[in-house]
Amino acid sequence: MKVGDLVRVRTKHYGSKLGVVIEINEDGIHIKPQKHPRNIIAGAADVVVLVSV
């Protein structure tokens, strides 16, 4: 997984969301969702790569 990958992330309150990885650091994977106003910080177990760049 790397920056720019299209991913599906499983969230606690909003279900599964599609988004793009914008940063990976020790806090987790930062994702910019397509149809949600806030960025998501997720653990690796909650993220599935759909399209790798």
PLM-predicted stretches and their roles:
Residues 2-53:
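Basic/aromatic-rich interaction segments and small domains that mediate binding to polyanionic partners
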